[in-house]
């Protein structure tokens, strides 16, 4: 069974599917669905997932409810599909770019820097989609939508932990450091950057966040890791 963090990496490695002309109608239908889901994710990033209904989205897109029902049979199905679309956008902008780098501290830092850049680029109208829905569902009763949201949060934390381990295996970070603890601290720093940006629109938080993260990693770096990072610097 694939571990959660590996699912994010698998998405990042996935190649686009090539269709022949016989699939033209299906491709057009998929393109329409993707456009709807992009709008749904933007709307949910502002208003939350609970307010995302077939009727609300139909009003936003100036479409008929029956037209949306052709793509999504229920509110829950729409919500789950919206989370999936947001996840794919997150993987494309945050997880995928650093996959070509060798395992180690450089790749870990690149992953985190891409995460911070994703916050700043505001891929969604309301800022980070997952920051919004995580806060929304934090105290909600368990249901299918909440479980998927919480699993996505766990996946990214797991990915950070895996990258810390790989940096340890590469000799860049102290092997006695607890990967889960360091991943937790890195996640907390990144989340603080996003909160500062969303609440105060203070761009200085990005530089502060990068410096804080770099210092935290420097504390746990090995001498060999410091030398390798210095050699790789432009």
Predicted regions and their residues:
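Basic, helix-initiating cap at the start of DNA-binding domains
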Residues: 1-47, 51-60, 77-80
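Short, solvent-exposed amphipathic helices
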Residues: 89, 125, 144-155, 162
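C-terminal peripheral helix-coil segments that are non-catalytic and often amphipathic
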Residues: 1-23, 110-117, 154-170, 180, ...
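An amphipathic alpha-helix adjacent to DNA-recognition modules
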Residues: 30-38, 45, 50-51, 62, ...
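Hydrophobic alpha-helical connector segments
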Residues: 81, 95-126, 179-186, 225-232
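Amphipathic alpha-helical segments used for helix-helix packing
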Residues: 107, 122-144
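Key DNA-contact positions within bacterial/archaeal DNA-binding proteins
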Residues: 66
């Amino acid at each position: 069974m694939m571990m959660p963090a590996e699912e994010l990496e698998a998405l990042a490695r996935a190649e686009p599917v090539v269709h022949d002309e016989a699939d033209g109608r299906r491709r057009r239908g998929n393109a329409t669905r993707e456009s709807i889901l992009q709008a749904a994710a933007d709307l949910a990033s502002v208003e939350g997932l609970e307010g995302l209904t077939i009727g609300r989205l139909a009003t936003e897109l100036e479409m008929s409810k029956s037209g949306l029902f052709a793509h999504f049979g229920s509110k829950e199905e729409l919500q789950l599909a919206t989370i999936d679309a947001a996840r794919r956008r997150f993987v494309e902008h945050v997880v995928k770019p650093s996959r070509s780098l060798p395992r180690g501290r450089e790749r870990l830092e690149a992953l985190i820097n891409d995460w911070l850049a994703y916050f700043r680029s505001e891929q969604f109208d309301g800022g980070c989609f997952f920051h919004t829905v995580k806060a929304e569902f934090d105290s909600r009763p368990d249901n299918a939508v909440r479980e998927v949201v919480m699993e996505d949060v766990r996946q990214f934390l797991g990915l950070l932990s895996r990258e810390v381990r790989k940096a340890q295996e590469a000799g860049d970070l102290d092997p006695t450091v607890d990967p889960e603890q360091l991943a937790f601290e890195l996640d907390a720093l990144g989340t603080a950057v996003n909160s500062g940006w969303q609440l105060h629109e203070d761009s200085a938080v990005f530089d502060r966040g990068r410096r804080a993260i770099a210092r935290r990693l420097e504390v746990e770096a090995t001498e060999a890791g410091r030398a390798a990072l210095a050699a790789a610097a432009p």
